[in-house]
């Protein structure tokens, strides 16, 4: 019985919702008809005549004040709507209408009735949204002391945001520290240094950690009863201190490379010792994991130093050896460094081999993967590609493959072509990127623009075909073609990662909400009316009367027809019934 009663109530509620949704026009005409029937007892004609007499007695100054006040109010609403749209990306009036008025009218019933069936799909989409909005470490990030700080000295601008540097500090604490650091004085100092916000304080702490390691401990070893000898024993060097100095204090890449080589000696020794002791307990295992991260980081940065200094083949060899030695550490994305170095060597066959391994459906994509694949496909046809010839004879199979690869890359990250085609100026890439966002596009184009320019006709092919991607995905936030729908969170995250002097690229381009345009038009129209009424009161009065008479002419015509059809004694007959 309870189920039957609840089912009846749900059916009744759905009928009411349906009537509100589709029959509001019928209800509106019924109300008008009822008002017409009750016009005599309600004395509507007398009230209207009283109102018209009151309006006729008003002076033009009243209308000027009225229109001026309306213009002021609509202008304030416009300013508030524009501010809310710039900050939150949506209209305040639309949000209030959807959030509060729509539930009152039953607009969410259809979704709530299917909640139990779609809970799994919602959780999957939420997980996908979280993974797409994850911030990643930039595998091609620059050196703070040798590159970012030099930019600041020259331009006076800060290329890194506080949010970006805070993420780097968290990464350093994750990779370079462990729970047993308090047992070694140098590591304890570095544990505090990674949390320090002031760069000079971090550098001073790194020097302090190295000075502690210079202390020599003496161990007394008795050789004979009458004499003793003192053995000098050096404490192990602190590799993370050298890392910090190489990253932040070194002003050139050559200086950074020297410090990283010293860090490599210290880090390699710590790694070998912890490798032998890793099975003795969880504490030793954590130390070995930390030492592994330190060693991989040092070798990767040494390879990047070699790449910066022009020793590209040496850098490629170091990266290949590192990937073979530590194949499971994919968090550093060393293959992206390798792809960039191989493109510099123009070793396109090796690039294709790396792509065959990492451009897999089960692995996370990146702009480097997608656009490098598109570059290789474009390289095969770009030197002979002509848009006029292609429009006459159609695209060949190779050209079609190249265009599809470009469309795939543009769908993954639609911000990259503007930087590759130099439609937008580049800045220094941040230390962290958001995949499919503007930050990733900057990081990719900063290092790969030269590789696209080196391939003859590649940028021309990109220029002719990249905008065609958007015709395939008219609603990118709702449905994608080859990838998941474009995440909504990219603009907010990119504004946190990129400096304020950079204009963040937004996709899809947001159109102004209807209510902003409406309030802008209303504000302008009422202000114009106020000005005209103040300047030409008599003429505007004549115009207003003519406008109102024209506006109400159809209604008066309908009322006359209704009065001619219905008998004059209808209300009297209805009261008798």
From Swiss-Prot:
Location relative to the cell: Membrane
Q: Which family does it belong to?
A: Belongs to the ST7 family.
The record's principal subcellular location, in a coarse class, is: membrane
Which PANTHER family is this protein grouped with? SUPPRESSION OF TUMORIGENICITY 7, SUPPRESSOR OF TUMORIGENICITY 7 PROTEIN
**What InterPro entries does the database record attribute to this sequence?**
ST7 (IPR007311)
Alphabetical list of Pfam families matching this protein: ST7 (PF04184)
| Any one GO cellular component localisation term in the record | membrane
Protein topology in the membrane = Multi-pass membrane protein
The UniProt keyword set, sorted, is:
Glycoprotein, Membrane, Phosphoprotein, Transmembrane, Transmembrane helix
Upper taxonomic lineage: Eukaryota, Metazoa, Chordata, Craniata, Vertebrata
Top-level taxon in the UniProt lineage: Eukaryota
The organism encoding this protein is Rattus norvegicus
So where does this one cross the membrane?
Answer: 15-35, 62-82, 512-532, 539-559
This chain belongs to which protein, by name?
Answer: Suppressor of tumorigenicity 7 protein
Modified residue annotations for Phosphoserine: 386
Glycosylated residues, chain numbering: 47
């Amino acid at each position: 019985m309870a189920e039957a009663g609840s089912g009846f109530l749900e059916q009744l509620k759905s009928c009411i919702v349906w009537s509100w949704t589709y029959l509001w026009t019928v209800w509106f005409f019924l109300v008008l008809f009822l008002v017409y029937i009750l016009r005599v007892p309600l004395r509507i004609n007398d009230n209207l005549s009283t109102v018209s007499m009151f309006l006729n007695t008003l002076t033009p100054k009243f209308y000027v004040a009225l229109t001026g006040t309306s213009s002021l109010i609509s202008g304030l609403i416009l300013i508030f709507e524009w501010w809310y749209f710039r900050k939150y990306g949506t209209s305040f009036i639309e949000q209030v209408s959807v959030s509060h008025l729509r539930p009152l009218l039953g607009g969410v019933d259809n979704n709530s009735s299917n909640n139990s069936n779609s809970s799994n799909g919602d959780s999957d989409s939420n997980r996908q949204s979280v993974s797409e909005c994850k911030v990643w470490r930039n595998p091609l990030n620059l050196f703070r002391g040798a590159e970012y700080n030099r930019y600041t000295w020259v331009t006076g601008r800060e290329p890194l945001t506080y949010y970006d540097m805070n993420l780097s500090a968290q990464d350093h604490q994750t990779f370079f520290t462990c729970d047993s650091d308090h047992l070694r004085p140098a590591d304890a100092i570095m544990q505090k240094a990674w949390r320090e916000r002031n760069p000079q304080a971090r550098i001073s702490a790194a020097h302090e950690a190295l000075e502690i390691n210079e202390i020599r401990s003496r161990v007394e070893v008795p050789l004979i009863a009458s004499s003793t000898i003192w053995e000098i024993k050096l404490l192990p060097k602190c590799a993370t201190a050298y890392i910090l100095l190489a990253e932040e204090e070194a002003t050139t890449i050559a200086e950074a490379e020297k410090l990283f080589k010293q860090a490599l000696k210290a880090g390699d020794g710590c790694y070998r010792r912890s490798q032998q002791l890793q099975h003795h307990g969880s504490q030793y295992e954590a130390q070995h994991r930390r030492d592994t991260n330190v060693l991989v980081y040092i070798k990767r940065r040494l390879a990047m130093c070699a790449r910066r200094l022009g020793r590209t083949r040496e850098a490629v060899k170091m990266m290949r050896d590192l990937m073979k030695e530590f194949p499971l550490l994919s968090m550093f994305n060393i293959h992206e460094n390798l792809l960039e170095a191989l493109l510099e060597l123009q070793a396109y066959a090796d690039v294709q081999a790396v792509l065959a391994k990492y451009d897999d459906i089960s692995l996370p994509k990146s702009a480097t993967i997608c656009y490098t694949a598109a570059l290789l496909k474009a390289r095969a046809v770009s030197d002979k590609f002509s848009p006029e010839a292609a429009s006459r004879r159609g695209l060949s199979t190779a050209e079609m493959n190249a265009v599809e690869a470009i469309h795939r890359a543009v769908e993954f990250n639609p911000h990259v072509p503007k930087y590759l085609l130099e439609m937008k100026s580049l800045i220094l890439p941040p230390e962290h990127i958001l995949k499919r966002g503007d930050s990733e596009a900057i990081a990719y184009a900063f290092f790969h623009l030269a590789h696209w320019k080196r391939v003859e006709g590649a940028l021309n092919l990109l220029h002719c075909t990249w905008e065609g991607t958007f015709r395939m995905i008219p609603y990118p936030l709702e449905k994608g073609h080859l990838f998941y729908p474009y995440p909504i969170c990219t603009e907010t995250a990119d504004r946190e990662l990129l400096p304020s002097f950079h204009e963040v690229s937004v996709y899809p381009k947001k159109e102004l909400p209807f209510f902003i345009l409406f309030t802008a038009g209303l504000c302008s129209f009422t202000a114009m009316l106020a000005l005209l009424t103040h300047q030409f009161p008599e003429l505007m009065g004549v115009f207003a009367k003519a406008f109102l008479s024209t506006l109400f002419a159809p209604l008066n015509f309908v009322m006359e027809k209704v009065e001619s059809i219905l008998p004059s004694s209808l209300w009297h007959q209805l009261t008798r019934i």
